[in-house]
């Protein structure tokens, strides 16, 4: 989860020509045992060796996050939230407080107008916190729940970079492919 996302972040930084933070620069917090969605869906043996969910807090100390909740209200949130109180299969709520249709993250330590949009499903949640140290604004869209047009968002917010962070299984889901296709046209 977090460590795999870190390696994805390093790859993005290399492509952008920016220096990634070393993993040792981040404050690490463990939130207890975790099983992934796919394993949870199998109703498999719950006594196997479980993974432990760890999250790495952004280096920057002036990061704020707002997101659109299920009722459409914009609320304050945390890029990394304490998920220790959640069940073993819900620990992933530590990242961006879960799968929200639309999230805006602001880093007040960055004074330029750098911005990006991350189009993702839940697999992208763990990667976004690493990006927060490099952009003044990050717009996060979970295309499964968002109903806007990506081109309008990019134009209206003057977004400079677009990242698609998804797992491979979305490519076999015609509904999700169709929904994403509608948003990017």
What are the residue ranges of the model-derived segments?
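Extracellular glycan-modifying ectodomains
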Residues: 1-185
